[in-house]
Amino acid sequence: MTASASKTAQQLKYIKDSIKTIPDYPKAGILFRDVTSLLENPKAYSASIELLSEHYSESGVTKVVGTEARGFLFGAPVALALGVGFVPVRKPGKLPRETISESYELEYGTDTLEIHTDSIQPGDKVLVVDDLLATGGTIEATVKLIRRLGGEVVHAAFIINLPELGGEARLTQQGIHCYSLVSFDGH
């Protein structure tokens, strides 16, 4: 193993170890992966931004899109490191300029996301960033918004993947390449 690969492996272990697991939250049977514990640790937070930025440094990305709210915490610093613009995708009524919206299904109901109509230009190569990939519904709606504006989603990046919930498989079927720093078993 090269020195660089060894450093990366150490960083990934440190990131994973910094994420606390809360049993039975928000309901019985769920193992909640709390990314805010990573944010409380500047070494782990910095490593996560560094690794994502390095991974996409030669990707040709022209915009980074972050989903409300924790996607902002990782997407904006990655955009800054890549030297490209950051675009927030938010809940309805939170963006001041003209928007388009996309609704999506939740376990018990629906939700809606919005994006400014002038934030993505036709031909933009977009990296979508969020903290956690579970079922993929939020990212799927985000991708639809970007594509409606003429952007090309190059990749979707996450700190945490929960593969058993099927989000990565769902997004891959739609031609979206996913990259996660760490994965956890369970829900």
From Swiss-Prot:
Gene Ontology terms for molecular function: adenine phosphoribosyltransferase activity
Subcellular location: Cytoplasm
Superkingdom in the source lineage: Bacteria
Keyword field contains Transferase: yes
Enzymatic class: transferase
Entry-linked HAMAP family: Aden_phosphoribosyltr
Protein name: Adenine phosphoribosyltransferase
Taxonomic source organism: Yersinia pseudotuberculosis serotype O:1b (strain IP 31758)
Gene name in the database record: apt
